[in-house]
């Protein structure tokens, strides 16, 4: 009667917990697992974990949990690409000198003097000036026309000297253009220097006259 009550209590209660069934691994199986662990390149910690499971007689895990050193780290955020400014176009290669010469890059345009006046006539004019000290052409230009009522005002000597110096400069430039500047350069420069001294004398004399005129007033 007592045993029957005891059976009823067991059946009505939670009952006994069943202990999981232990597995006995043969030495051959253990050796095979060791070889497989080496081939799988498991760490020492993972190998010891599996060996402990085998010693306890538990079922082998389907996946071996990685160690802390092998845990997958959170993927780093991919940095956004940096856009650099566009590179300037490369400088073109320099052409060799012989190619430049062939294309005429080094050729210079030859100077061609352009005579604006009759050089022979100008030379004759200057020779007359050197010989007589007078400019016949200038006198011809200054001659008043026959029908002119009032005579043209006579040019001031200072202005005449300025004009004569300018004419000699132009003549020397024309001779330089013809390659004959060396022949006339000394004479022309001497004439210009003489006329400059005469202009200085005129200027000095005018200054004295102006000073005297201001003193008398």
Curated annotation (Swiss-Prot):
Against InterPro entries, the record matches this protein to: UPF0193
Q: Name one Pfam family in it.
A: UPF0193
Superkingdom, according to UniProt?
Answer: Eukaryota
The family this protein is said to belong to: Belongs to the UPF0193 (EVG1) family.
Protein name in the entry? UPF0193 protein EVG1
Query: What gene is this protein translated from?
Result: C22orf23
């Amino acid at each position: 009667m007592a045993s029957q009550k005891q059976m009823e209590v067991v059946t009505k209660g939670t009952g006994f917990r069943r202990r999981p069934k232990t597995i006995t691994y043969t030495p051959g199986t253990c050796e095979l697992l060791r070889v497989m662990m080496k081939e799988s390149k498991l760490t020492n910690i993972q190998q010891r974990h599996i060996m402990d499971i085998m010693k306890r007689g538990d079922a082998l895990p389907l996946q071996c949990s990685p160690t802390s050193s092998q845990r997958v780290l959170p993927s780093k955020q991919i940095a956004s690409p940096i856009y650099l400014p566009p590179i300037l176009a490369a400088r073109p290669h320099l052409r060799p000198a012989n190619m430049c010469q062939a294309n005429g890059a080094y050729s210079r345009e030859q100077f061609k003097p352009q005579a604006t006046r009759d050089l022979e006539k100008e030379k004759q004019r200057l020779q007359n000036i050197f010989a007589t000290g007078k400019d016949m052409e200038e006198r011809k230009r200054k001659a008043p026309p026959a029908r002119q009522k009032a005579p043209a005002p006579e040019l001031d000597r200072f202005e005449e000297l300025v004009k004569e110096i300018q004419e000699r400069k132009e003549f020397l430039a024309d001779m330089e253009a013809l390659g004959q500047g060396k022949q006339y350069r000394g004479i022309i420069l001497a004439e210009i220097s003489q006329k400059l001294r005469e202009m200085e004398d005129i200027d000095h004399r005018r200054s004295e006259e102006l000073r005297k005129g201001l003193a008398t007033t």
